[in-house]
């Protein structure tokens, strides 16, 4: 089987090569972003998703954990926090312009396990949603402390392999009526060895708006206790500008691109 099976767009045909880097995939038709927690997707690839959504792509979100540990408040009602974070994630997706599904798998925050059951579930989502491009955590990021981020990346990579091959997880056809599906490309954010960038110069404000939908994270992740997000916005703008500068861009998000799926 080739990397691009019939019906898939030649996504890399319009990617520009700059030495060891490629840039700006042809806007895909269907995209699946897979994050460990609510807000991980917006941090990792929010500008890219906003750009593709504006080009007509169907953007889907898949969040693996319930986000129940995402607070410094030791007395927090975790059930309420889970519900709140799901609401925030849906609102963030809307702000990116995403019109696809927002799915929550509900694994306990901090206890995400890279096992066959989770790989099966994510592979089923890939087969059902048929993304051209999948985006997720780089599981090989050195010194990555959070186990959910490492495991989410491994689950994503293993699920792509399971979803693409017809003899893996054959019960999906019998039970759900979905055949195998091979995405054309995988983009891993926070990449240990980045080799691809997307120009998001026109989408920084949209990324920020989506991040700011995660109001429960203002204190813990965004480092504000009074609702003043100016310092947080400055950090994000500076980070995107720093990533874009070597490529002559005002802002960029960078990834490790794997296109031999």
Predicted feature locations:
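Metal-dependent de-N-acetylase/amidase catalytic core
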Residues: 2-32, 113-261
């Amino acid at each position: 089987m080739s990397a691009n099976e019939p019906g898939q767009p030649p996504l890399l045909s319009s990617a520009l090569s700059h030495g060891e880097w490629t840039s700006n995939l042809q806007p895909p038709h269907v995209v699946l972003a897979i994050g460990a927690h609510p807000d991980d997707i917006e941090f990792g690839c929010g500008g890219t998703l906003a750009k593709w959504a504006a080009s007509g792509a169907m953007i889907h979100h898949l969040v693996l954990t319930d986000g129940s540990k995402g607070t410094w408040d030791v007395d927090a009602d975790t059930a309420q926090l889970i519900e709140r974070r799901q609401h925030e994630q849906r609102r963030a997706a809307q702000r990116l312009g995403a019109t696809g599904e927002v799915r929550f798998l509900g694994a306990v925050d901090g206890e995400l396990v890279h096992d066959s059951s989770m790989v099966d579930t994510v592979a089923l989502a890939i087969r059902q949603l048929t993304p051209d491009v999948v985006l997720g955590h780089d599981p090989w990021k050195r010194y990555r402390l959070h186990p959910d981020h490492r495991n989410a990346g491994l689950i994503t990579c293993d699920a792509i392999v399971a979803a693409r091959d017809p003899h893996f997880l054959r019960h999906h056809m019998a039970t759900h009526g979905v055949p195998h599906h091979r995405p054309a490309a995988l983009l891993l954010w926070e990449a240990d060895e980045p080799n691809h960038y997307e120009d998001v110069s026109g989408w920084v404000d949209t990324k920020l708006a989506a991040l700011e939908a995660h109001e429960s994270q203002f204190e813990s992740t965004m480092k504000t206790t009074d609702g003043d997000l100016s310092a947080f916005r400055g950090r994000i703008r500076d980070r995107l500008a720093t990533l874009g500068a070597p490529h002559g861009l005002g802002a960029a998000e960078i990834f490790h691109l794997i296109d031999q799926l």
